[in-house]
């Protein structure tokens, strides 16, 4: 089935769309066509965005044609499903679906566009009291317990923990003293577990902090560690998730957290002293705690390796429930 994935060029949004496509592919064949949505006049991108959203109020085919005309042409012939994420794609997705009668799946907060404009509108909290608005337990991403298990290898027996490191952002602010304490805690943890840690930094990690981690932990991290500012961008984490005995992730990145959770492994989020995050984000993280998908601790606290059951069964049930709901909504 030919599926159009509309991209706004933001990697996190694109990965969410790909995550939904991967979920559906477990039951049906999908032929993905990825197209980046671009306005005809790039300098007018901001007003186009606002006008397109406004036109989605009581959307008609006439209004939909106006919205479509703002953007460079996209060939939708033979397309049977539209998937898109992010506010910048929502108006176009709604308009194209109305004009072509192709079912659409939209991810992300509505930004003023009603969920009724989408067959399935996936959000982390309820915005509209309509069945189209489906509330997610886990933000969609590229990983699943099965994909991580299939990607694992003999290194899964090395008792290694995985550390996903972010940085400043969404109201989380880390002091250097906190990073230094985390470094000492990782050293203590590796000695306690007689293992090395696998460390993955990200776009959000300050280059100086990445260098500090590399230099201070040079004898304590595995060769599989990935350093974003040293050529490690856009790494596929399936193997690392599959091999990890436990996952620690800084709490500033919802995508890193959702990816970690989706592996089915035990996940602990690490937070700094200084947090001034939007309520929507803190509620999102709290929901993961309430579902017992994560536990959380200060980045300065001692790291623990408690034995316990993984979340693989729970994650698989959540995935099956979401997949069933989507198929019902798009009538496939």
Per-segment meaning from a language model:
Residues 2, 80-81, 120, 160, ...:
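Structural motif
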Residues 5-134:
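Active-site and donor-binding regions of nucleotide-sugar-utilizing enzymes
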Residues 13, 237-278:
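A donor-sugar binding/catalytic signature common to diverse glycosyltransferases
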Residues 33-34, 121-123, 196-203, 268:
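Short internal beta-strands
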Residues 110, 115-178, 301, 305-306:
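A nucleotide-sugar donor-handling region in carbohydrate enzymes
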Residues 168-200, 205:
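Conserved catalytic-core segment of nucleotide-activated headgroup transferases in glycan assembly
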Residues 213-255:
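Donor nucleotide-activated moiety binding/catalytic core segment of transferases
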């Amino acid at each position: 089935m030919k599926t159009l994935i509309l991209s706004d060029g933001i990697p996190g949004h694109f990965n969410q769309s790909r995550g939904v496509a991967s979920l559906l592919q477990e039951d049906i064949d999908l032929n993905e066509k990825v197209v980046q949505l671009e306005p005809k006049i790039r300098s007018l991108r901001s007003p186009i965005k606002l006008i397109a959203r406004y036109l989605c109020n009581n959307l008609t085919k006439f209004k939909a044609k106006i919205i479509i005309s703002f953007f460079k042409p996209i060939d939708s012939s033979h397309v049977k499903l539209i998937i898109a994420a992010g506010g910048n794609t929502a108006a176009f997705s709604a308009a194209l679906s109305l004009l072509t009668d192709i079912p659409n799946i939209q991810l992300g907060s509505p930004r003023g566009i009603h969920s009724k404009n989408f067959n399935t509108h996936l959000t982390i909290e309820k915005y509209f009291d309509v069945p189209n608005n489906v509330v997610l337990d886990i933000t969609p991403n590229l990983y699943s317990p099965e994909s991580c298990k299939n990607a694992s290898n003999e290194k899964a027996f090395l008792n290694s923990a995985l550390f996903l490191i972010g940085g400043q952002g969404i109201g989380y602010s880390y002091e250097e003293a906190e990073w230094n304490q985390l470094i000492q805690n990782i050293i203590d943890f590796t000695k306690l577990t007689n293992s090395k840690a696998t460390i993955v930094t990200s776009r959000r990690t300050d280059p100086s902090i990445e260098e500090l981690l590399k230099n201070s932990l040079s004898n304590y991290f595995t060769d599989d560690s990935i350093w974003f500012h040293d050529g490690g961008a856009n790494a596929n984490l399936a193997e690392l998730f599959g091999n990890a005995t436990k996952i620690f992730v800084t709490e500033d990145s919802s995508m890193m957290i959702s990816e970690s959770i989706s592996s089915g492994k035990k996940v602990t989020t690490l937070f700094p002293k200084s947090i001034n995050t939007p309520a929507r984000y803190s509620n999102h993280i709290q929901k993961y705690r309430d579902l017992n998908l994560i536990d959380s601790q200060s980045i300065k606290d001692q790291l623990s390796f408690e034995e316990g059951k993984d979340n693989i069964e729970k994650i698989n049930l959540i995935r099956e429930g979401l997949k069933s709901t989507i198929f019902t909504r798009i009538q496939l």
